């Protein structure tokens, strides 16, 4: 919702927005704007218009405010840095980018996967440690499968799924059922 507001638990999100804005603006020299609950409705409307026209803004940095009810069909590329495991929310985020628009034959989505640790370190975990990871891993696998299923480059998603399943000793059947059981130490 464009009117979504922050709570005190969202200070990490605010820091992340600030960091991404700083990196894109200062390190990459891009013209970016934040689209958050801190901007008033008039400012948000101006940001959407400038981005849609393509005459100034190269990127919009947002958390929550672009989830539902915001229409910016000109978005061609999205970097989803902090994705949700809520299917409705990630389908809306994907749909936000995939909307048809003039001179937009396709869109590119970079969806960053969040795992509890690097895959090459999983082999050193105890069974109990790996079990604690599995809820997040399971949710990320489901999201990767959903995004990959409809993408033009599904082989990348399939390779990542295979790497994750191999690291955590998750079979295809367990992955499909969602009933993951970690192998032996």
Model-based region annotation:
Residues 30-31, 171:
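Short coil/loop linkers at secondary-structure junctions
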Residues 173-185:
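The feature captures the C-terminal accessory region of ATP-dependent helicases
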Residues 151, 168-171:
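Short, flexible helical or helix-coil boundary motifs
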Residues 22-30:
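Short helix-loop-beta junction
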Residues 31-158:
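Conserved RecA-like P-loop NTPase helicase motor core
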Residues 156, 164-167:
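A conserved mid-domain beta-alpha-beta active-site/ligand-binding segment of alpha/beta enzyme cores
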Residues 16, 25, 133-136:
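Glycine-centered helix-coil hinge/cap
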Residues 1-21:
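Conserved strand-helix element at the start of the C-terminal RecA-like helicase core
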């Amino acid at each position: 919702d464009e009117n979504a507001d922050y709570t005190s638990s969202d200070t990490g999100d605010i820091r992340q927005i600030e960091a991404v804005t700083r990196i894109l603006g200062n390190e990459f020299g891009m013209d970016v704007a934040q689209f958050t609950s801190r901007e008033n409705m008039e400012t948000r409307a101006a940001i959407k218009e400038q981005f849609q026209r393509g005459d100034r803004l190269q990127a919009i940095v947002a958390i929550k405010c672009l989830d539902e009810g915001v229409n910016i069909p000109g978005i061609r590329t999205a970097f989803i840095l902090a994705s949700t495991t809520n299917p409705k929310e990630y389908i809306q985020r994907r749909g936000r980018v995939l909307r048809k628009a003039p001179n937009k034959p396709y869109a590119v989505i970079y969806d960053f996967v969040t795992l509890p640790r690097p895959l090459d370190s999983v082999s050193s975990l105890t069974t109990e440690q790996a079990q604690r990871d599995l809820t997040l891993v399971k949710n990320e696998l489901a999201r990767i499968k959903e995004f990959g299923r409809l993408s033009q480059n599904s082989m990348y998603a399939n390779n990542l799924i295979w790497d994750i399943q191999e690291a955590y000793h998750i079979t295809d059947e367990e992955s499909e059922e969602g009933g993951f059981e970690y192998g032996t130490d």
